Amino acid sequence: EDWAIIIGGWDTLFFGNPLLQDRTFSMDVKGLFETVIKDSEIVHPEPYTQWEYYNQQCSLAEAFDKVINQTDDHSDLGKPNMYLCKAEEKGAANALASVKAKQNKDITIVVQPFGRSARVDNGDIVDDSSRSIEPHVYYKLVKKLSQKYNIIFMGEGEFAKEVEEEDSYSEKPQIPDIRAWAAIIEASDYFIGCDSMGQ
């Protein structure tokens, strides 16, 4: 079959995937309309609008499968894979070793408290879509978890800056690359997040 994936962002997540890498195109590729889009039937999957997904009755991968392949039988889906390179894996191992040396615990948890729609508004973190953990809840969570676990805060710089006064428990690395974050999440023991980026 001749098919392609056109993605508005995060196309680097597909790098290294033997099935998807050569079929994935960023929206800003010159000539994309003429070479790929013009003669194609377009399927615009939006898994977040699937009842089963937002009621936690199917995974994100199953929601995509339902929309793209028009099926409720997901038995043929394998485990999702991210193909990381050695440098990404080594970078994650080094980051975790640094966190473990500072926080001195055996188990590491990455916490992503704020979703994509969160923003800073006059010193407060707000999320109009209500998909983020409220800051006061996040502070209680990391305070409690930090008694037994190493904590890594996953979030953009403006959020790290806003939480640093109340959250002295977590490491707050500023990593703009989502593949590096994927490697850190994969190398960690647990992940707590409210946004599909981390999931």
State the predicted function of each range.
Residues 48-56, 118-133:
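Short, flexible/disordered intra-domain loops and linkers
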Residues 5-7, 112-113, 152-155:
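Short beta-strand segments
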Residues 2, 104-106, 148:
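A general structural motif
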Residues 1-61, 180-183, 190-193, 198-199:
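Active-site and donor-binding regions of nucleotide-sugar-utilizing enzymes
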Residues 48-115:
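A nucleotide-sugar donor-handling region in carbohydrate enzymes
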Residues 4, 10-15, 119-120, 157-164:
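Short, charged/polar "capping" segments at the starts of alpha-helices
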Residues 124-199:
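Donor-binding and catalytic core of enzymes assembling or modifying cell-surface/extracellular glycoconjugates
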Residues 1, 41-45, 114, 118-124:
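A short, surface-exposed helix-loop junction/capping segment
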